[in-house]
């Protein structure tokens, strides 16, 4: 929006409403221009305490207030299927619901937690680790630890930290395939189990691991630079990545505990990362 304001103000002047991608599908289905709470909370334009668009931020950026649509709670009715779609598909009127547009919050709804205080870990290419709160925590400590407050189902706050996930494993596997060594993820886990434990650690969030490419070589260079044993075999590299991720999760949990003042007995893990028995076990350890 700020780019448009500075470089293509003519487009912004013609805009009626800003509709985020998940809300666009609801608009196509119903004709209603609404903003679902969870996806709106990811824009940095939401007041986390009020659950409304932040007039303070919008005014500071000099953005037109009229383009921001009404925010609707997650899990509530947006509208009904349009007459045109009903006729085309031969359907009766159907309610269209505002499901959690933010995929992490959608996954979190499925967490089978019975206790009030728990840690969730949504693990895929990225990992998101956090807890649910009734109210946001916005202070110097949460800012220092770079922990965010995102909106969720039932008006709850997901107090969470973004961490790299299985990206390093995925990119390492692609590199080995380029080198003529193609292994399935199950094969990589078997090799990792046979490698020595707690030999070396990387910071998975270090900037050198973000670009695609030869991640195994970057891991070895990181270990040399930090005075650690260097993982040479494929199994050693995979074990290093998994143990480093588990250690990163532990570190993030300690930061969340420090901010909330709560103790957590249970971690619920969801997402594609749960298919890795090795990562699940290291995380539990």
Predicted features along the sequence, with ranges:
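Nucleotide/phosphate-binding loop and acidic/charged catalytic motifs
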Residues: 35-40
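Glycine-rich, mobile lid/loop segments that gate access to catalytic sites or pores
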Residues: 6, 76-77
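A conserved helix-loop-beta module that forms one wall/lid of the active-site cleft
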Residues: 61-74
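Short, surface-exposed acidic/glycine-rich loop or hinge patches that mediate macromolecular interfaces
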Residues: 76, 273-274
């Amino acid at each position: 929006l700020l780019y448009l304001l500075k470089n293509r103000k003519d487009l912004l002047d013609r805009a009626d409403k800003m509709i985020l991608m998940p809300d666009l599908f609801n608009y196509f289905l119903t004709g209603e221009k609404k903003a679902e709470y969870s996806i709106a909370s990811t824009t940095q334009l939401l007041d986390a305490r009020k659950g409304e668009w932040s007039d303070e931020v919008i005014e500071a950026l000099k953005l037109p207030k009229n383009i921001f649509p009404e925010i609707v709670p997650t899990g509530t009715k947006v509208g009904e299927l349009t007459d045109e779609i009903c006729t085309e598909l031969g359907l009766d009127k159907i309610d269209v619901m505002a499901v959690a547009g933010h995929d992490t919050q959608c996954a979190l709804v499925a967490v089978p937690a019975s206790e009030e205080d728990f840690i969730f870990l949504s693990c895929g290419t990225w990992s998101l680790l956090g807890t649910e709160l009734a109210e946001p925590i916005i202070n110097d400590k949460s800012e220092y630890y770079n922990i965010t407050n995102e909106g969720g189902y039932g008006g709850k706050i997901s107090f969470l930290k973004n961490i790299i996930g299985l990206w390093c494993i995925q990119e390492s596997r692609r590199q080995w395939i380029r080198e003529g060594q193609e292994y399935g993820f199950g094969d990589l886990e078997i090799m990792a189990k046979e490698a020595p434990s707690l030999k070396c650690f990387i910071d998975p969030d270090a900037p050198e691991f973000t670009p695609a490419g030869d991640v195994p070589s970057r891991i070895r260079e990181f270990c040399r630079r930090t005075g650690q044993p260097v993982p040479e075999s494929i199994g050693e590299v995979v074990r290093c990545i998994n143990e480093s991720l588990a250690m990163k999760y532990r570190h993030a949990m300690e930061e969340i505990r420090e901010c909330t003042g709560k103790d957590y007995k249970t971690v619920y893990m969801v997402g594609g990362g749960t298919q890795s028995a090795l990562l699940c076990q290291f995380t539990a350890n």
